[in-house]
Amino acid sequence: MTKTDYLMRLRKCTTIDTLERVIEKNKYELSDDELELFYSAADHRLAELTMNKLYDKIPPTVWQHVK
């Protein structure tokens, strides 16, 4: 799967808590290469949830608000 595929699946998560649960579950199930793509998509989704806005590409200024 690609980062975009993971991102589309993660967009079903509507809260940060749900996203964290999905991240925790997949941490043990994915290979290292898949995990790198998954974490990238998860960070992207976390930024979207934090700003309450969907992005194709996250602006650099948004990352200062993400914990």
Curated annotation (Swiss-Prot):
The keyword NAD does not apply. GO terms for molecular function: DNA binding. Coiled coil: none annotated. The keyword Electron transport does not apply. Keywords: DNA-binding, Transcription, Transcription regulation. InterPro entries: Hemolysn_expr_modulating_HHA (IPR007985), HHA_sf (IPR036666). It comes from the Bacteria. Monomer. Interacts with H-NS, in the absence of DNA. Belongs to the Hha/YmoA/Cnu family. The lineage of its organism: Bacteria, Pseudomonadati, Pseudomonadota, Gammaproteobacteria, Enterobacterales. Disulfide bonds: none annotated. This is Modulating protein YmoA. Modulates the thermoregulation of VirF, and hence the yop regulon, as well as the expression of the enterotoxin gene yst. Involved in chromosome structure and DNA topology; probably by means of compaction of DNA in conjunction with H-NS; probably requires H-NS to bind DNA. It holds the Pfam family HHA.
